Amino acid sequence: MQFRRIDPTPFTLKEFLQPFTLFKYPSVVVPTIAYSIIFGFCSVLLTVEIPQLFLPKFHFDPQAIGLQFVSIIIGTVLGEQLGGRFSDWFMGHRHKQIGRKPAPEHRLWLSYIGYTLVVVGFIIFCVQLENITTYNVTPVVGVAIAAAGNQIITTTLVTYAIDCHVEQSGSIGVFVNLVRSTWGFIGPFW
């Protein structure tokens, strides 16, 4: 197997710096920052805190701790299925109502569902973790709900940014991942 570049022209510095030019577009920067913060809470914080909280409270071994993360997988898969399909349906329905392609901002209404699920999921996780004395699955049900909300927000906000600047879609993906990864690294320190 050989890795090579599809385009025969050599890499240039401009190609590496081009995603940084997206900082000039609020329609890319604002959703990226909003998504990165939610990602920091729903993915990074939960994966760091579950072992820290469950080990002393329930005396779990590494396998039992690892099984708690299945809730993130389940929530993410469900959130993607709901978020992607509903987002496309929502925009298609609006297209039929007004007889033309709706503005990309119309899609942002769906992110409220995701934000609500994140808050509800965190409330369930925190309250149930505090109240139970012997383990039951209710705290990780909250984690799954928050993960579903995270994925709905991901789908909605990234698709919105791409809808606003279709010609920059590849760079938007790089930009979102750069900001998200940077925020995910910084997040656990505060």
PLM ranges: what are they?
Residues 2-5, 10-11, 15-18, 36, ...:
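Generic, low-specificity signal for short hydrophobic/alpha-helical stretches with a mild N-terminal bias
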Residues 30-40:
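A single, central transmembrane helix in multi-pass transporters
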Residues 39-190:
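C-terminal transmembrane bundle
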